[in-house]
Amino acid sequence: MKDKNIKISGNFVRIHLSGSFLKFQSIYNLKKLYLQLVILTIVAFFWGLLGVIFVQFSGLYDIGMASISQGLARLVNFFITSQNINVDSATIFNAIFWLTQILFNVPFFIFGWFKISKKFTLLTLYFVAVSNLFGFFFSYIPGIDNFFLFANLTTAKDGGFENLINEKGVQLIFWEKSAEKQVSLLFYGLIWGFLQAVFYSVILIIDASTGGLDFLAFWYSEKKYKDIGGILMLINTVSFIIGYVIGTYLTGSLSVQSYVGDDKHQPFGVAFFLSPNLVFTLLMNIVLGLFTSFYFPKYQFVKVEVYGKHIEKIRNYLLDNQQWFSITMFEAEGGYSRQKTQVLVTNCLLIKAAKLLEDVRKFDRDALFSITFIKKLDGYIYDRRTNKQTKHGTENKS
């Protein structure tokens, strides 16, 4: 292998440094539809399988509109179990838990079709349908309802109050009870939050989403140039609270109305609302938002500096190909060699910097390409016009 480090003089060595600017950078280059569908199918497979393990039988809730359908499934399952209704409760529970999410998404598909893009909506429709069908079928694997990575979250060790709740199909644990269950549920939330962030980032890179309220988050993010991670965290929290109240707070309280116990566990009391299920799902949502911003920094602004000998050629190429970067150019003098070098400076989005690097390397393989993250920016930037957007701004200001 040829050594790219070249000795210049004495102990001075020119060292070649290189690094990927974007996480999952290779996925950004997938433009063929069949490859995008393959990636979405793989993600949907694991989303459905792990959703059964980490959410359906743990008492946690998923993100977005899914949490509401999950809450309804748990509410219906509670009434069937508590009233001893002679129906196939497992099928009803699984169908509501997974398949109603597809129906709930219909208004959002219409919104996305007209407000975002047809391709985005169709890819999202594909992912929502496939992932929920995978989850529905995986929920029928024999014994999966009693498969836990850590402690068993449904078996009561002390009987009495906790056993009464579990017998009626309510997935709820309390702070005063088994610490083993609390720690297990905490790990479930942290792991699933991280995995969702990875899956979700890949889905967004392909230009799709998980459906539901994601359409609103994506639309607002595009319209206001806001980071999508924080927006997701907010809307997911609101939808989760609704699902939690329906599927856990209400069902848990109704299940013990006839039970005479201590004052800490009165129906509709604080213990039923501020449970580990609530706290750890909120924590999971925070992990999801933070890691989504990390893996998919769509609106992270950076300052790019390019030092090279062919800056004029790079400038002409960018202008001829309508690459809307606002450019500042000047000549600098090396402090050691006193040689003149040209410098190109621009402020842009991080995901655009990767494309800019490709353009620079077409004309100057030895140019120094430097990126500095910008925490605050006040002014305007250029962004290439698309079918969904209009051009923004006239010049950079940082």
Curated annotation (Swiss-Prot):
Listed Pfam families: DUF2179, YitT_membrane
UniProt-listed InterPro entries: DUF2179, N-reg_PII/ATP_PRibTrfase_C, UPF0750_membrane, YitT
Cellular component aspect of the GO annotation: plasma membrane
Transmembrane segments: 37-57, 92-112, 122-142, 186-206, 228-248, 268-288
Membrane topology per record: Multi-pass membrane protein
Cellular compartment(s): Cell membrane
Keywords of the record: Cell membrane, Membrane, Transmembrane, Transmembrane helix
Protein name: Uncharacterized protein MG432
Organism of this sequence: Mycoplasma genitalium (strain ATCC 33530 / DSM 19775 / NCTC 10195 / G37) (Mycoplasmoides genitalium)
Lineage, top ranks: Bacteria, Bacillati, Mycoplasmatota, Mycoplasmoidales, Mycoplasmoidaceae
